[in-house]
């Protein structure tokens, strides 16, 4: 299985370094696309200040984001996988944090946000954010800081976090109403 992961990672990372335009676009995705996704959710929160269902959706996305990153921190304590560029496998186009590679925090966070919107029946925006999450995950492999399996692992963590929050934090419960009105 490692050989397949390695081959897929090398294939995607092998596309880097051939066009500065493409490299710059992908580097932007790898570094900044997650912030754009967060900004979109926050803008919906403020735009629909008096519409509680949209605010609830934004709250679920935020809680899913936090849960996914917390789960990644725990997994990171248990699974120590060197980043592919640190292992000499890929060439990195960006600097990265000095933590372990698996699972991808960017992937977990972006898929948590996109999946939360999907589970809250905000399908149109969710589809756009799933496309953004896939682009973000692929860009992290392209720039050489993650294996493909790191991104897939992060996507599973994000999806699971969003599912758990969506199922346990319903729109009609008292806690949800209080939190939405509080902020």
Model-derived features: positions:
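Short, hydrophobic transmembrane alpha-helix segments
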Residues: 22-25, 46-51
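Hydrophobic core of alpha-helical transmembrane segments in multi-pass integral membrane proteins
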Residues: 35-45, 66, 70
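Membrane-helix interface segments
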Residues: 19-21, 52-56, 121-128
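N-terminal transmembrane-helix/juxtamembrane module of multi-pass inner/ER membrane proteins
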Residues: 1-37, 72-99, 176, 180-183
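Membrane-embedded catalytic cores of phosphoryl/pyrophosphoryl-handling enzymes
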Residues: 94-183
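Membrane-interface loops
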Residues: 53-119, 177
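Alpha-helical transmembrane segments
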Residues: 29-36, 57, 61, 107, ...
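Membrane-water interface at transmembrane helix exits
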Residues: 13, 43-47, 72-80, 118, ...
């Amino acid at each position: 299985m490692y050989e397949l992961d390695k081959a897929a990672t090398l294939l995607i990372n092998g596309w880097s370094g051939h066009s500065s335009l493409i490299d710059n676009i992908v580097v932007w995705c790898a570094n900044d696309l997650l912030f754009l996704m967060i900004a979109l959710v926050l803008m919906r929160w403020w735009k629909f200040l008096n519409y509680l269902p949209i605010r609830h959706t934004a709250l679920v996305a935020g809680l899913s984001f936090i849960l996914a990153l917390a789960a990644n921190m725990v997994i990171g304590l248990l699974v120590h996988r060197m980043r592919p560029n640190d292992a000499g496998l890929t060439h990195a186009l960006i600097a990265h944090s000095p933590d372990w590679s698996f699972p991808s925090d960017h992937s977990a966070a972006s898929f948590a946000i996109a999946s939360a919107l999907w589970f809250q029946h905000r399908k149109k925006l969710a589809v756009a954010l799933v496309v953004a999450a896939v682009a973000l995950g692929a860009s992290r492999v392209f720039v050489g800081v993650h294996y493909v399996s790191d991104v897939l692992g992060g996507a599973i963590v994000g999806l699971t976090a969003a599912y758990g929050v969506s199922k346990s934090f319903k729109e009609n419960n008292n806690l949800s109403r209080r939190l939405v009105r509080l902020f």
